[in-house]
Amino acid sequence: MGLTREFLRDLQELRRVVEPAGVRLAAQRATAQDLADIEAAYAGMKHAIEQGGDYVSNDLRFHQGLLRACHNRMVVQMSKALGALLRTSFEISTSRPDGPATSLPLHRAVLDAVIARNPDQAERACLVLIAGAQDDIEQVLASRRKLPSLAAPAARLKARVPPIP
Protein backbone atom coordinates (compact mmCIF):
# COMPACT_ATOMS: atom_id res chain seq x y z
CA MET A 1 0.00 0.00 0.00
CA GLY A 2 1.48 3.32 -1.03
CA LEU A 3 1.59 6.21 1.39
CA THR A 4 0.12 9.30 -0.16
CA ARG A 5 -0.63 12.69 1.31
CA GLU A 6 -4.35 11.91 1.08
CA PHE A 7 -3.93 8.54 2.80
CA LEU A 8 -2.05 10.11 5.70
CA ARG A 9 -4.61 12.88 6.08
CA ASP A 10 -7.43 10.32 6.08
CA LEU A 11 -5.60 8.33 8.76
CA GLN A 12 -5.17 11.44 10.93
CA GLU A 13 -8.85 12.23 10.45
CA LEU A 14 -9.74 8.70 11.56
CA ARG A 15 -7.56 9.18 14.64
CA ARG A 16 -9.40 12.43 15.47
CA VAL A 17 -12.70 10.54 15.27
CA VAL A 18 -11.73 7.41 17.26
CA GLU A 19 -8.96 8.19 19.74
CA PRO A 20 -10.46 11.13 21.69
CA ALA A 21 -13.68 9.17 22.29
CA GLY A 22 -11.69 6.09 23.29
CA VAL A 23 -9.51 8.11 25.66
CA ARG A 24 -12.63 9.69 27.18
CA LEU A 25 -13.94 6.20 27.95
CA ALA A 26 -10.52 5.09 29.21
CA ALA A 27 -10.62 7.92 31.76
CA GLN A 28 -13.85 6.40 33.05
CA ARG A 29 -13.07 2.68 32.74
CA ALA A 30 -9.33 2.03 32.93
CA THR A 31 -8.25 -0.56 35.48
CA ALA A 32 -5.09 -0.38 37.56
CA GLN A 33 -3.51 -2.91 35.17
CA ASP A 34 -4.50 -0.82 32.14
CA LEU A 35 -2.82 2.22 33.70
CA ALA A 36 0.30 0.23 34.55
CA ASP A 37 0.54 -1.00 30.94
CA ILE A 38 0.16 2.51 29.54
CA GLU A 39 2.70 3.85 32.06
CA ALA A 40 5.15 1.14 30.95
CA ALA A 41 4.71 2.14 27.31
CA TYR A 42 5.27 5.79 28.24
CA ALA A 43 8.41 4.84 30.18
CA GLY A 44 9.64 2.98 27.08
CA MET A 45 9.09 6.09 24.95
CA LYS A 46 11.00 8.24 27.44
CA HIS A 47 13.83 5.69 27.63
CA ALA A 48 14.09 5.60 23.83
CA ILE A 49 14.51 9.38 23.72
CA GLU A 50 17.01 9.58 26.57
CA GLN A 51 19.09 6.46 25.95
CA GLY A 52 18.15 5.35 22.45
CA GLY A 53 15.82 2.61 21.39
CA ASP A 54 12.51 1.82 19.78
CA TYR A 55 10.29 4.84 20.36
CA VAL A 56 7.68 3.95 17.75
CA SER A 57 6.79 0.49 19.12
CA ASN A 58 6.33 1.99 22.58
CA ASP A 59 4.27 4.82 21.09
CA LEU A 60 2.02 2.23 19.45
CA ARG A 61 1.76 0.31 22.76
CA PHE A 62 0.78 3.58 24.46
CA HIS A 63 -2.03 4.38 22.03
CA GLN A 64 -3.31 0.82 21.79
CA GLY A 65 -3.18 0.58 25.58
CA LEU A 66 -5.36 3.65 25.88
CA LEU A 67 -7.86 2.19 23.44
CA ARG A 68 -7.85 -1.17 25.25
CA ALA A 69 -8.50 0.71 28.49
CA CYS A 70 -11.80 2.01 27.11
CA HIS A 71 -13.06 -1.60 27.37
CA ASN A 72 -15.12 -1.41 24.20
CA ARG A 73 -14.54 -4.57 22.15
CA MET A 74 -15.23 -2.87 18.82
CA VAL A 75 -12.72 -0.09 19.50
CA VAL A 76 -10.13 -2.64 20.66
CA GLN A 77 -10.59 -4.70 17.48
CA MET A 78 -10.35 -1.57 15.33
CA SER A 79 -7.14 -0.63 17.15
CA LYS A 80 -5.63 -4.03 16.37
CA ALA A 81 -6.64 -3.76 12.71
CA LEU A 82 -5.11 -0.29 12.42
CA GLY A 83 -1.87 -1.18 14.19
CA ALA A 84 0.37 -1.21 11.10
CA LEU A 85 -1.13 2.03 9.82
CA LEU A 86 -0.72 3.76 13.16
CA ARG A 87 2.87 2.53 13.43
CA THR A 88 3.64 4.03 10.03
CA SER A 89 1.99 7.30 11.03
CA PHE A 90 4.13 7.36 14.19
CA GLU A 91 7.26 6.59 12.12
CA ILE A 92 6.56 9.65 10.00
CA SER A 93 5.59 12.00 12.82
CA THR A 94 8.70 11.03 14.81
CA SER A 95 11.09 11.31 11.87
CA ARG A 96 11.63 14.99 12.65
CA PRO A 97 14.68 15.29 14.93
CA ASP A 98 12.70 16.93 17.76
CA GLY A 99 9.45 15.05 17.09
CA PRO A 100 9.60 12.46 19.88
CA ALA A 101 10.87 14.89 22.53
CA THR A 102 8.18 17.40 21.57
CA SER A 103 5.37 14.85 21.68
CA LEU A 104 6.39 13.14 24.93
CA PRO A 105 4.85 15.80 27.24
CA LEU A 106 1.68 15.69 25.13
CA HIS A 107 1.47 11.94 25.75
CA ARG A 108 2.04 12.58 29.46
CA ALA A 109 -0.87 15.05 29.51
CA VAL A 110 -3.19 12.40 28.06
CA LEU A 111 -2.03 9.78 30.53
CA ASP A 112 -2.27 12.15 33.50
CA ALA A 113 -5.86 13.04 32.58
CA VAL A 114 -6.78 9.35 32.30
CA ILE A 115 -5.15 8.62 35.67
CA ALA A 116 -7.06 11.58 37.17
CA ARG A 117 -10.31 10.12 35.78
CA ASN A 118 -10.99 13.38 33.95
CA PRO A 119 -12.70 12.45 30.63
CA ASP A 120 -12.99 16.04 29.37
CA GLN A 121 -9.32 16.79 29.96
CA ALA A 122 -8.28 13.42 28.52
CA GLU A 123 -10.22 14.10 25.34
CA ARG A 124 -8.77 17.63 24.99
CA ALA A 125 -5.23 16.39 25.62
CA CYS A 126 -5.70 13.66 23.02
CA LEU A 127 -6.84 16.19 20.42
CA VAL A 128 -3.76 18.33 21.14
CA LEU A 129 -1.53 15.25 20.76
CA ILE A 130 -3.12 14.29 17.43
CA ALA A 131 -2.85 17.89 16.17
CA GLY A 132 0.86 17.84 17.00
CA ALA A 133 1.31 14.60 15.08
CA GLN A 134 -0.59 16.10 12.14
CA ASP A 135 1.75 19.12 12.16
CA ASP A 136 4.77 16.80 12.21
CA ILE A 137 3.40 14.79 9.29
CA GLU A 138 2.65 17.94 7.28
CA GLN A 139 6.23 19.16 7.83
CA VAL A 140 7.66 15.82 6.73
CA LEU A 141 5.43 15.84 3.64
CA ALA A 142 6.48 19.41 2.84
CA SER A 143 10.15 18.41 3.10
CA ARG A 144 9.56 15.76 0.40
CA ARG A 145 11.49 13.19 2.41
CA LYS A 146 10.96 9.59 1.41
CA LEU A 147 8.10 8.12 3.42
CA PRO A 148 8.62 4.81 5.25
CA SER A 149 7.13 1.61 3.92
CA LEU A 150 4.29 -0.08 5.77
CA ALA A 151 6.49 -3.21 5.93
CA ALA A 152 9.62 -1.50 7.28
CA PRO A 153 10.76 -2.29 10.84
CA ALA A 154 10.46 0.44 13.46
CA ALA A 155 13.32 2.94 13.48
CA ARG A 156 15.43 3.23 16.62
CA LEU A 157 16.33 6.55 18.20
CA LYS A 158 19.84 7.47 19.23
CA ALA A 159 20.35 8.54 22.85
CA ARG A 160 19.54 12.15 23.64
CA VAL A 161 21.15 14.23 26.34
CA PRO A 162 20.07 15.71 28.75
CA PRO A 163 17.31 13.50 30.20
CA ILE A 164 13.73 14.70 29.93
CA PRO A 165 12.11 15.50 33.31
Spans of model-derived segments:
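C-terminal-biased regions
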Residues: 99, 105-112, 123-165
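Short linear motifs at protein or domain termini
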Residues: 1-24, 144-147, 151, 155-165
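Short coil/turn linker and secondary-structure boundary residues
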Residues: 3-6, 30, 98
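Conserved amphipathic alpha-helical segments that form helical-bundle/coiled-coil interaction surfaces
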Residues: 11-92, 103-112, 121-136
